[in-house]
């Protein structure tokens, strides 16, 4: 009753009743007149930082989403088209919002649905000449071919620098992403050795996603043929937990806020083994967050350039 009396008092107030009474038929035109008096002001885009999200990582598929204020870019597209779209959907990303897809090399776990995705979504497809040749992309899709150490504009406010790395017979590249505020994030997988060139670039990054593919003892005791063991552990293979730990020990710097260990072998590694090996090497110098990216993602995102916690569960 008190609320009803209060509303009655307000409705009888002569000041409130000064607004003109408008019939239903007139209301639309009245609203248009009111809106026409509003002065449009330029809206500045809000800097939300750079978001790094692993959609999944491992021998059955790899893809990383980089999001900024105005751009969405995929590094690799190694799942089925349906699988990629489902993963993006969990993040609230409409596939048509993907500006570019950069494929690091031709192996299926990195390139599987890249062409189909680019055609369906209207995204730019980016690769080096060797990958484009092996995948037979030339002339069948809108393709941007890059050279070694070339910086590519992948979206309105993000560029990608490609750094060659040794891996089998593939012309593989590591990717250094840079937004318009100068923040850098690296995605580094499928390499048997961390080169001096790569180290120099990683020392400038605030986020590093890097593979820790196998535990050496576990690989050697496992059931793989000796030839495959040699390939995996060779210069053109993958990084072991030990190699990754040693590389990060050299790379870690005060501005490095997050590390993700990725592309872990399901047969020759375990998450806690990779994590403990790396922590033993960097625990005295690294104060950021260390995470493991698994095959079935997305599980979490990392943010650069925000005051919020850098790791956010998806």
Where are the language model's segments positioned?
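Conserved beta-strand hairpin/beta-sheet module of binuclear metal-dependent hydrolase folds
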Residues: 18, 29-91, 173-190, 207
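Structured catalytic core of nucleotide-sugar glycosyltransferases
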Residues: 53-63, 106-114, 132, 136, ...
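Active-site metal-binding loops of divalent metal-dependent hydrolases
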Residues: 56-57, 77-79, 106, 165-168, ...
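Active-site neighborhood of phospho(di)ester-bond hydrolases with catalytic His/Asp-centered motifs
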Residues: 75-78, 99-106, 126-129, 186-189, ...
């Amino acid at each position: 009753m008190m609320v009803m009396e209060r509303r009655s008092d307000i409705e009888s107030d002569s000041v409130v009743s000064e607004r003109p009474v408008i019939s239903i038929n007139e209301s639309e035109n009245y609203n248009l007149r009111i809106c026409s008096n509003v002065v449009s002001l330029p809206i500045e885009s809000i800097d939300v930082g750079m978001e790094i999200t692993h959609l999944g990582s491992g021998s059955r598929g790899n893809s990383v989403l980089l999001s900024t204020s105005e751009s969405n870019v995929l590094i690799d597209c190694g799942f089925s088209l349906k699988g990629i779209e489902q993963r993006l959907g969990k993040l609230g990303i409409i596939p048509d919002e993907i500006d570019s897809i950069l494929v690091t090399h031709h192996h299926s776990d990195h390139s599987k649905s890249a062409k189909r995705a680019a055609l369906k979504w209207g995204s730019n497809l980016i690769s080096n000449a060797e990958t484009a040749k092996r995948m037979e992309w030339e002339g069948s899709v809108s393709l941007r071919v890059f050279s070694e150490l070339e910086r590519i504009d992948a979206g309105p406010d993000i560029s990608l620098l490609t750094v060659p790395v040794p891996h089998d017979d593939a012309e593989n590249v590591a990717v250094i992403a840079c937004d318009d505020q100068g923040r850098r994030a690296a995605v580094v997988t499928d390499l048997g050795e961390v080169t001096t060139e790569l180290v120099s670039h990683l020392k400038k990054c605030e986020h590093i996603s890097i593979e820790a593919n196998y535990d050496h003892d576990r690989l050697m005791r496992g059931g793989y043929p000796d030839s495959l063991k040699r390939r995996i552990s060779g210069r053109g293979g993958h990084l072991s937990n030990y190699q990754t730990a040693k590389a990060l020990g050299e790379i870690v710097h005060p501005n490095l806020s997050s590390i993700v260990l990725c592309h872990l072998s399901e047969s020759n590694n375990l998450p806690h083994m990779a994590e403990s090996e790396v922590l033993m090497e960097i625990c005295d110098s690294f104060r950021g967050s260390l995470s493991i990216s698994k095959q079935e993602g997305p599980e979490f995102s990392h943010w650069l350039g925000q005051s919020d916690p850098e790791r956010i569960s998806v």
